[in-house]
Amino acid sequence: MTDRLSPERRRYLMQQVRSKNTRPEKAVRSLLHSIGYRFRLHRKDLPGTPDIVFPSRRLVLFVHGCFWHGHGCRIGQLPKSRLDYWSPKIEANRARDQRKEAALAAEGWRVAVVWQCELSDLGALEARLRNILDPS
């Protein structure tokens, strides 16, 4: 199946895909802030430049888009076209995520992932985040 968009238009649209300060990331940050947690953003001195960092808790949060990071939910399903491109791309993203998590764990950091689809139930996400941040 051919792309309905011109190469210039497709390039422009792909350039608009953000890697930092995405809508899901901002929603998680807003939720964390509203329940009283303070954090640091995008620490470049840590492996993988985590989205949200809690230095005193030695905890990092990655906010993953379900499609780009290959989550098993409905949003994370691969497109039906160009599987020869998308399958290796998403698998490479997943492998990179695992390497980043392993490197952080080796440095003594706890790692948690918040998936984009979890934002559909903010109450459950808040409870999960509280449990991660203050395990008792």
Curated annotation (Swiss-Prot):
Keyword list, A-Z: DNA damage, DNA repair, Endonuclease, Hydrolase, Nuclease, Restriction system
One of the GO biological process terms: mismatch repair
InterPro entries associated with the record: DNA_mismatch_endonuc_vsr, Restrct_endonuc-II-like
GO molecular function: endonuclease activity
Known EC number: 3.1.-.-
Lineage top rank: taxon: Bacteria
Top EC class for this record: hydrolase
DNA damage in keyword set: yes
Family: Belongs to the Vsr family.
Functional description taken from the UniProt entry: May nick XorII sequences that contain T/G mispairs resulting from m5C-deamination. If unrepaired, these mismatches can lead to C-to-T transition mutations. The very short patch (VSP) repair process counteracts the mutagenic process by repairing the mismatches in favor of the G-containing strand. This enzyme is an endonuclease that nicks double-stranded DNA within the sequence CGATCG (C-methylation site unknown) next to the thymidine residue that is mismatched to 2'-deoxyguanosine. The incision is mismatch-dependent and strand-specific.
Protein name: Type II nicking enzyme V.XorIIP
Organism for this UniProt entry: Xanthomonas oryzae pv. oryzae (strain KACC10331 / KXO85)
Organism lineage string: Bacteria, Pseudomonadati, Pseudomonadota, Gammaproteobacteria, Lysobacterales
Gene name of the encoded protein: vsr
